[in-house]
Amino acid sequence: MSGSTGERSFADIITSIRYWVIHSITIPSLFIAGWLFVSTGLAYDVFGSPRPNEYFTENRQGIPLITGRFDPLEQLDEFSRSF
């Protein structure tokens, strides 16, 4: 075996008290932050995806599928005009 890199082993890290003190706070905090990000609707605003009640409006009930192989830009323009 070659020389030691000076790093602690994984088993040594996960059995330390300091690891669990830090991670017992950060892991639940990340979970709660993610849940709030999604449940408040901020994820829809940040990523620009439609909310569940905005997929189909009264004037647009069809599914926006690209069916033509040779004219996809025309179909995309048609779909974007309906927004």
Curated annotation (Swiss-Prot):
It comes from the Eukaryota. It holds the Pfam family Cytochrom_B559. Its main location: plastid. Its cofactor is heme b. With its partner (PsbF) binds heme. PSII binds additional chlorophylls, carotenoids and specific lipids. GO terms for cellular component: chloroplast thylakoid membrane; photosystem II reaction center. Heme binds at residue 23. One of its GO terms (biological process) is photosynthetic electron transport chain. It is found in: Plastid, Chloroplast thylakoid membrane. SUPFAM superfamilies: Cytochrome b559 subunits (SSF161045). The chain crosses the membrane at residues 21-35. Keywords: Chloroplast, Electron transport, Heme, Iron, Membrane, Metal-binding, Photosynthesis, Photosystem II, Plastid, Thylakoid, Transmembrane, Transmembrane helix, Transport. It is a single-pass membrane protein. GO terms for molecular function: electron transfer activity; heme binding; iron ion binding. Belongs to the PsbE/PsbF family. This b-type cytochrome is tightly associated with the reaction center of photosystem II (PSII). PSII is a light-driven water:plastoquinone oxidoreductase that uses light energy to abstract electrons from H(2)O, generating O(2) and a proton gradient subsequently used for ATP formation. It consists of a core antenna complex that captures photons, and an electron transfer chain that converts photonic excitation into a charge separation. This is Cytochrome b559 subunit alpha. It comes from Daucus carota. The lineage of its organism: Eukaryota, Viridiplantae, Streptophyta, Embryophyta, Tracheophyta. The gene is psbE.
